[in-house]
Amino acid sequence: MWFSCATTSSILFVAAVVLASAPQGNTESICTLSDSETCAVESLTSPSADGSVLVYPGGDTRCAFDNYQDSTTGFTTNSTYFFQVFPNTNLDKSKLLIFFQGGGGCTDDNTCAFGLECSLAENALFTTVATVRGAGVIDRFMMDNMFKDWNVVFVPYCTGDVHVGNKVLPPFESGFEQQLGNPQCLGKNLPMHMNGYNNSKAALGWALQNFPDVENLVVGGASAGSLGAQFFSSHIAEMWDVDAKGTRFSIMADSYVGVLPDSRPLPVLLEYFGACDNGRPFPADVAAICGDGNASTTEVVEALIEDKPDTNWLFINSKGDDVQRYYYALVKESIQGYPFPNLMSEEDLYRNMSAILEAYQAVSPRITTFYVEGDHHVFLMEKNFTSYKSDKDLLLGDVINEWLSSNSSLNLDTVSAEIEIAPKTSGTTL
């Protein structure tokens, strides 16, 4: 019957499952913003065992759905939002990593609705609770993690809108939910809050207040967070005034490029999320492209690249990424197409993905791409992320170190001891 293939289901929703786990905090690792409490980084002196503090901003932040606990399936929602801060232990504020979490996504009224998400239970399309992870680039105890001594602001994801939504959807049930066998999930009358923009804005505002004059600012993201990092790139560069201050500014986008069907191009999704208004998060010229339903992913991100031409970009992807292929099918067919028997092939994904990234390289010499053979999804949240090899047998850790060590006048004609850098006219492909 429908939804009978557990293996396919696990692959389809892996982005929502593997990228989140419950935080292990205690009272000493929490700070709540208020009129009398700014949670200044200097005051965060009692971090939890992983070196982090959870900051609860309150205000207009929240996750997608009101609080709910399903006693049958264990499906949980919680409206409360927080972000996670890893301060440098010596209060050295020269380096800051802002990282947008992944965790699935929704695409339309069917897939964004509470009834379907609850009925899917452990296979929900996106995370509905703010969560954290301690692995990969945010692991303070991983010896070869090049970010272990950076200040890190980790932006959790619980809204299904690639961090940029600004819209409330009324309760909706299409009838498909009834086929999933969880009638207790139906008729709850819960709206869906696409609140990613406000959540991101709260984390970014706190980060700017506490790290206003960094020398090196990297904005990263994995899966849905990869798109969040890309979409917020110009906005963050303006917030930190990187051009005037000479800040080295970089975007590290892991495992989502934005290969989408012509029938529902990126601006259509962004408009659905309520993300195309000027300043949320796009500058005016990009917002205009965003509002054009016929524009492509390439046109939107190219405009962001050209808006801040000194930004350094690193795109990390596997050539056959299974989640990117399934999300393409979900956007094209909605939930009615499940279990998506005719997925885009790995070869077609790579061809489309590389065409997009080559277009970016044509407008900027600061685009580096790192391709891994296979279908793996997300690298930077893995405990062994530095050891992944590219299709040219280069280690991801070596590539990131080279990428970070280059100054703002990066000369792409140079050849390092370990990494061959491509000609200036074509960006860098590793």
Residue ranges: model-predicted function:
Residues 1-4, 428-430:
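A positional/structural detector of protein chain ends, strongest at the extreme C-terminus
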Residues 4-22, 27:
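Cleavable N-terminal signal peptides of Sec/SRP-targeted secreted and luminal proteins
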